[in-house]
Amino acid sequence: MMVYIMNAFDIKSTKMDVLSISLHTSDLFDLEDVLVKLGKKFQESGVVPFVLDVQEFDYPESLDLAALVSLFSRHGMQILGLKHSNERWAAVAMKYHLLFCLSHSENVKELGQVEVQKTEDGQKARKTVLITSPVRTGQQVYAEDGDLIVTGAVNQGAELIADGNMHIYAPMRGRALAGAKGDTSARIFIHSMQAELVSVAGIYRNFEQDLPDHLHKQPVQILLQDNRLVISAIGSE
């Protein structure tokens, strides 16, 4: 007799506190000296997760990333992802099965992030991160404290996260999570709706089957109403 287990798991939005290591040198011997002392602290606590901030390095070729990840791991420090303001590092992260976090820098406009503008009352407007390249399977892009605009296709298995709104002007086949820090007014706008999962402020919906024809592969907006996700065709009203 065959037994089928229904609802074996749920997919929910979550946040995990992870420390960041800002790397200042590519010299493995210098790092080893520091980690021999520092690593004892983490080895006593078990494996501790980190994101490796490589903002000080312009080109991926300047780092032996495999050796770096291995070095930190030997001292109880598990590297989960890379952080940089240039999108070229996303492919590097994927190569080594790491997450990618798009960070902010002073040169944000040419590196893919729109500058922070000020509103009429002098207050800072929300930051906007712009991604023009495709987001591939296994990659994650996070627009911290801001909105996210994506003009490249988002593949199945890729994940987009924004603390604010999200605009995707291309086929969306991955996961889209807006209002990640609890902003219930956040919205998601998708040019071609084919997403695996969407979420606003932690309220999510996954899609095991295609949506109705008037929504599937059509422009849609997604928002919260009465603590429920509402998906509607853009221009339908």
From Swiss-Prot:
Pfam families linked: MinC_C, MinC_N
UniProt superkingdom: Bacteria
SUPFAM superfamilies found in the cross-reference section: Cell-division inhibitor MinC, C-terminal domain
Leader sequence segment: none
Keyword flag Transmembrane: no
Keyword Ribonucleoprotein: no
InterPro entries (alphabetical): CAP/MinC_C, MinC, MinC_C_sf, MinC_N, Septum_form_inhib_MinC_C
UniProt keywords, alphabetically: Cell cycle, Cell division, Septation
GO annotation (BP), single: cell morphogenesis
Xref: NCBIfam families: minC
Family listed: Belongs to the MinC family.
HAMAP family, sorted: MinC
Its biological purpose: Cell division inhibitor that blocks the formation of polar Z ring septums. Rapidly oscillates between the poles of the cell to destabilize FtsZ filaments that have formed before they mature into polar Z rings. Prevents FtsZ polymerization.
The protein's assembly and partners: Interacts with MinD and FtsZ.
Protein name (record): Probable septum site-determining protein MinC
Organism per entry: Neisseria gonorrhoeae
